[in-house]
Structure formats: structure tokens, C-alpha cells
Amino acid sequence: MQNKVIRLGEIEISNDKPFVLFGGMNVLESRDMAMQVCEAYVKVTEKLGVPYVFKASFDKANRSSIHSYRGPGMEQGLKIFQELKDTFGVKLITDVHEIYQCQPVAEVVDIIQLPAFLARQTDLVAAMAKTGAIINVKKPQFLSPGQMGNIVEKIEECGNDNVILCDRGTNFGYDNLVVDMLGFSVMKKVSKGCPVIFDVTHALQCRDPFGAASGGRRGQVTELARAGMAVGLAGLFLEAHPNPSQAKCDGPSALPLSALEGFVHQMKAIDDLVKHFPELDTAN
């Protein structure tokens, strides 16, 4: 199977190229924090030679509670994104939830993300595809890896073949997620070689069945990320925070920003090792 290569400036996103770190914070909490977090990622990735794309949400539209923080909104969020791009020269990824958001977001951001809960909404998928931007599709927790081919087909039928697939875990009973490591190769196959990345942060979610916000298992982020990187992936999707216990969204799953360099160093070492191995044909 031929692996597709998506080019984002000087960055090449592909399953057999050096991994790309899609890293940042869960939601934009403030302009100053976004600058702090982005600067930390840029310093680490430049030092280690890892291609980098900054990620954050301007609106967490699917929070469990109506009282939970959602973000600054699209208008203010895009201003912050533009400042990050101007200051650090980074590429950007963020999610959209409504059709009207697609075009204005695509004018600032390099990759627009289709949220897991909305991944089968055909009108939204079509609107995103028609912007011509690179599309990152989050695999719904309730969908098998093999079904992702149908979503890719929708995007391609709209004239856009710049598609990335992202696994963020699969429902395992109530209020728990697991990651099927065999699912990554299934997604590569059904998408005919699209880049596949791993959202290790959201895969660590573990809900309180009666709570208003997600819990998480950030103490296990390194183990889970190591396992995913050993498969051979196009990228890793990661959220970090200066003080996870005070984060306004998904703090229990966020990597402490102080641990970022050591974490990325390990992921790069695994990626370098795996991608130097020759591919073995064990199916025949």
C-alpha cells in the first residue's frame, strides 16, 4: 500500500515519514497562556528536530455541562491564532462545529478538524472539504476503524483528498475508552494510505458517570503514547498545560508542560527506531 503524503509548507505528513507533533492546549483559555504554551512547544520541537503544528480549540461546543467553560469564541480565537502564527511562524489546527465556521477558520488555520461526535454529519463534512483545507477526522468513539473509509470517501467526493485520520479511543462499556492498536493499520488500509495520527490525550479520558466533566489518567500518558508510536504513525496529537489541575477543560488528561521535552524526546526515539525497520509482509 502506498502511503499518501500531505505537504504543509515544509512539513510532510505521512505514515512512513518522521512523526509530526500536533500539540498545544485543549481550549484557548487566554491570549497570554496560548503564547506561553506555543512558545514552549516551539522551543522543544526545534531543539529535537520534530515537525510541529499548534493545536487548540476556540469553542468546546460539546462540553457535558452547560456551565462548563467553552472558550473565547471564533472571532477572538482566530485573532489569537493569527498572532501565534505571526509570532512563532507555526502551522495551526483547530476544530469546527458549525457549517458557517468552516470558511473563516480555513482562512487563518492550516488544518481544520472534524470532531468525533460530528464525523458522520454529511453537510458539515462537505462544507469543510470544500474549503480546500487539510481535514483531520477524529474517529468517533462509537465507530469501528473500518468505517472511517466512508468518511474519507465523502471528503474526496467533494474534491478534497487532503485527509488525516485520528484515533482518540473507542468506547469500552460505559464511561471508559480503550485504544485498539490494530485499528491504526485498518484505518490506513480503508483510507488507501491516508496519514493516521493518535490523540493520546483524549484516549486517556475516564468519565465519572454522574459528573459534569471528564476525568483522566495522565499518569499513564507515556505508556499509552509509547504503544501508539511503536505502530508507526504519521503523528501524535497531544495537549499540555502549565498547571493541569487548574485547566478549564480536560486537565486530568493533560501532560504537565514541564514534562514536554522529556516526553517528546522519548516519542522521537521510538518513531526513529520503528521507521528504520524494513516493512515485513506477514499476511501471505
UniProtKB/Swiss-Prot annotation:
InterPro entries: Aldolase_TIM, DAHP1/KDSA, KDO8P_synthase. Pfam families: DAHP_synth_1. GO terms for biological process: keto-3-deoxy-D-manno-octulosonic acid biosynthetic process. Its EC number is 2.5.1.55. GO terms for molecular function: 3-deoxy-8-phosphooctulonate synthase activity. GO terms for cellular component: cytoplasm. Gene3D superfamilies: Aldolase class I (3.20.20.70). It comes from the Bacteria. Pathway: Carbohydrate biosynthesis; 3-deoxy-D-manno-octulosonate biosynthesis; 3-deoxy-D-manno-octulosonate from D-ribulose 5-phosphate: step 2/3; Bacterial outer membrane biogenesis; lipopolysaccharide biosynthesis. Keywords: Cytoplasm, Lipopolysaccharide biosynthesis, Transferase. It is found in: Cytoplasm. It catalyses: D-arabinose 5-phosphate + phosphoenolpyruvate + H2O = 3-deoxy-alpha-D-manno-2-octulosonate-8-phosphate + phosphate. Transmembrane segments: none annotated. SUPFAM superfamilies: Aldolase (SSF51569). Belongs to the KdsA family. HAMAP family: KDO8P_synth. PANTHER family: PHOSPHO-2-DEHYDRO-3-DEOXYHEPTONATE ALDOLASE. This is 2-dehydro-3-deoxyphosphooctonate aldolase.
